[in-house]
Amino acid sequence: MKKFVLGIGFMLLATGITFAQVDRSKLPASGPAPEIKIGEAETFTLANGLKVFVVKNTKLPRVSFTLVLERDPILEGDKAGLTTFIGEMMMGGTKNRTKDQLDQEIDFIGASLSASATSVSASSLKKHQGKVLELMADVLFNPVFPETELEKLKKQSLTGLATTKDDPQAISSRLSRAVLFGKNHPYGESQTEQTTKNITLDDVKAYYQTYFKPNIAYLAIVGDIDKAEA
């Protein structure tokens, strides 16, 4: 026991000496920055104007596809909040699949598929790339925009707005954006209960028909795939 106590004492003493030698008035030197290696992108443009970028990376047997719309920010005005619904509406079902069928097929192959007002993204194992592309294309080209889905999203949004109505942080954020950008700027406007109620199914369809066009978009393909396969 005595040897054990002495050993602990020497350890603490040594540690104390080490700590005493550290100059805590100076920040420790940073380590070397991690090296990020990104493969060189191969690019080409389709006849419809869609720009395609392919980056081959065989580290994992996975492939991801991301379609991005290159559009300027838009002022939603008395329909503020419209763009927050677009992605969910596109994922709400297609001419070929209901929402549940779409979700089941995605889950069955362990893939991911999502959409927003400015993008559609999908990823899967390489062996399922054909299937996930089929599902992505179905969402992109054949959305049916069910009205029941829009009503559900509007109710959820109204509930969310009600919970943040008296939240100091949410109020501060809205005021800050309005002061910085102005209420009539895309970054300064805020979604309200009234603007949410103003949104109609025709607004959703009009947005989709206006902005989801190949000549203002690019498709990034990254993973275990090359230009020939793409």
Question: For each predicted feature, which ranges?
Answer:
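Proteolytic maturation boundary segments
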Residues: 4-7, 17-54, 226-230
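Short, linear, compositionally biased motifs with a strong N-terminal bias
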Residues: 10-11
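Acidic/histidine-enriched segments that form metal/cofactor-coordinating
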Residues: 22-24, 29, 103-207, 225-228
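Envelope-exposed proteins and targeting segments
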Residues: 40-42, 46-50, 61-67, 81, ...
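Solvent-exposed coil/turn segments that connect beta secondary-structure elements
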Residues: 47, 51, 57-59, 68-74, ...
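Divalent metal-coordination and catalytic microenvironments
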Residues: 49, 67, 84, 136, ...
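M16/MPP (pitrilysin/insulinase) zinc-metallopeptidase core fold and M16-derived inactive scaffolds
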Residues: 66-126, 189
